[in-house]
Amino acid sequence: MNKNYYVIFTLIFLSFLSFKTSAQYNPEIVTVKGSTFNMGTEKNPYIETDEQLAHDVTVNDFEIGKFEITISEWELYTRDQKLKFPNIRYISKQSPIHSISWVDAVNYCNWLSKKNGLKPVYKIVNSQYVCDFNANGYRLPTEAEWEYAAYGLI
């Protein structure tokens, strides 16, 4: 799957590992019951090779955003962090954010975690982002969590 689409879709289904504190900084979440499912696909010339070879994967219970992160929510973040809002077209402030990078998405997760008094999940170690799955803050879903949710297996 194209990395840009993966970032967009994962942000759309932003996973959350905490409980609500403030409606302004806390999108509605749902709990997904974990299970085993068949992930990936068989050889297909239209599918990237890293998505091939279907195999069974087990995901644990996780939480995920019920709705997309909106333009309005992203504006709140960029304004608070004094960042430039992306030059994008949208229909309304309730439209989902798009055309952002994976780094933008994890920085948003850390910002949202801090706003809610939670431990940020992502940190930079040796110039690379590392995910601390033991932290109680917001994070993006893993590839398996995303695929499980995207297939409607929740």
List where the protein language model places each region.
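Boundary at the C-terminal end of the N-terminal hydrophobic targeting segment
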Residues: T21-Q24
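Bacterial N-terminal signal peptides that target proteins for export
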Residues: M1-F9
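C-terminal, low-complexity/hydrophilic appendages and adjacent surface loops
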Residues: I47-Q52
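Active-site microenvironments of metalloenzymes and redox enzymes
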Residues: T36-Y46, V57-I154
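Bacterial N-terminal signal peptides
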Residues: I8-F16
